[in-house]
Amino acid sequence: MADEQTLDTQNLDANQAPEASGDDLAARVQVLEEQLAGAQDQALRVAADLQNVRRRAEQDVEKAHKFALEKFAGDLLPVIDSLERGLELSNPDDESIRPMREGIELTLKMFHDTLKRYQLEAIDPHGEPFNAEQHQAMAMQESADVEPNSVLKVFQKGYQLNGRLLRPAMVVVSKAPAPVSPSIDEKA
């Protein structure tokens, strides 16, 4: 009889357990669904972060390839400037230096061709409007012949590598002539 009571108690507990566990299961399902949604959201974020890291790494590698020559090219610019200055200062009519002058011209042409091949472009803005992003004004000079803020003279060419400024052009910029004030004699 004690065994029957134990079995009855177990049967009662078993009958009540499914009702309680049904509510518990529904709550548990709700919690698990929320956890699943959170895990899926987190997985999407991690995938997006991974994609962003890959994209940034690809961009960094591309920039490294594109601008790897920046320091080397910057170190070559004074050599090019010296060759150009030597040509400017030498007399083209002097027959005694003609072979040397031709050699410098050919060397300079080879330099320019090589620079062009690696997308290193000269900025020679003579006569163009002043552009503060590419030019550095070394002086201002009054001029009635050209528009104000135009480049009158280029002291040193600028250069850009793949569109990025490597060195600004050093220039003299025009300004409008000062208005002439009438002299005392003209006033009288």
From Swiss-Prot:
GO cellular component entries: cytosol
CDD domains assigned to the protein according to its UniProt record, in alphabetical order: GrpE (cd00446)
Subcellular location field: Cytoplasm
Keyword set, alphabetical order: Chaperone, Cytoplasm, Stress response
GO molecular function, one term: unfolded protein binding
UniProt keyword Chaperone present: yes
Residue spans crossing the bilayer: none
Pfam family for this entry, one: GrpE
Domain of life of the organism encoding this protein: Bacteria
GO BP term (any one): protein folding
InterPro entries: GrpE, GrpE_coiled_coil, GrpE_head
Family as reported in the entry's similarity comment: Belongs to the GrpE family.
Subunit field text: Homodimer.
Role according to the record: Participates actively in the response to hyperosmotic and heat shock by preventing the aggregation of stress-denatured proteins, in association with DnaK and GrpE. It is the nucleotide exchange factor for DnaK and may function as a thermosensor. Unfolded proteins bind initially to DnaJ; upon interaction with the DnaJ-bound protein, DnaK hydrolyzes its bound ATP, resulting in the formation of a stable complex. GrpE releases ADP from DnaK; ATP binding to DnaK triggers the release of the substrate protein, thus completing the reaction cycle.
Full protein name: Protein GrpE
Lineage, top ranks: Bacteria, Pseudomonadati, Pseudomonadota, Gammaproteobacteria, Pseudomonadales
Gene encoding the protein: grpE
